[in-house]
Amino acid sequence: MYDPRPVLLVIAHGSRDPRHAATVHALTRRVRSLRPGVRVETGFLEFNAPAVPQVLDRLAAEGVRDVVALPLLLNRAFHAKSDIPAVLRQARPRLRIRQAEVLGPAPLLLTALERRLYEAGLSPSHKRSTGLVLASAGSTDPEAIAVIAEIARELRHTGWCAVRPAFASAALPRTDDVVRELRSTGVDRVAVAPYVIAPGRLPDRIEAGARAAGADVLAAVLGPSAELARVLLTRYDESRAALPLAMTA
């Protein structure tokens, strides 16, 4: 029987680090638990199986018509602008695919990020005396860098003493440099918040920089949090609402 609800295809980058795929699958399980009526599939761009083209071929063979392809990315940079559209263009013509927006920025992501900081030992009362490093993966895309800077400003407005962006690759400054910079301003403590979804090489680089520079608090990655799962479903709903009526009836 034809299901008018589009399949949600979560597209992750993939990694040689097994923690990455484990986190992605844990997140998609949480999404399924929040919206049991929606079919959720996972595909990877590289390193992990199944690859996105394999998932799309299987869906087409099963008679699926409509797919919302959701990049599991916090920022709109190269993968969202180039890699993923190129892969989706190779899909079978019978599939009607809409690429959803990336996850960030979104208020729920900041909620998840602050919750990770509190889980790491901070409390809301510490905000006014804590310098915060917003550590992201990094990008050569100016738009992506500007978004991270804007998120840092938004966090500053929620009460943190100071918030500075840092990047694990492709852009400067690095995490250790920003930890030392904040320390030099005389804040009581310095905390590092990885603005990344899953463990892997770049988050490990963030952790190494934080520890090398003597950060007082290092939060965990966002991971398969309830907030992240809710943002995924919000992006799915936005894309579904934008589809032609015949695809959403």
Language-model features: locations:
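Active-site-proximal alpha-helix that buttresses catalytic centers in soluble enzyme cores
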Residues: 1-249
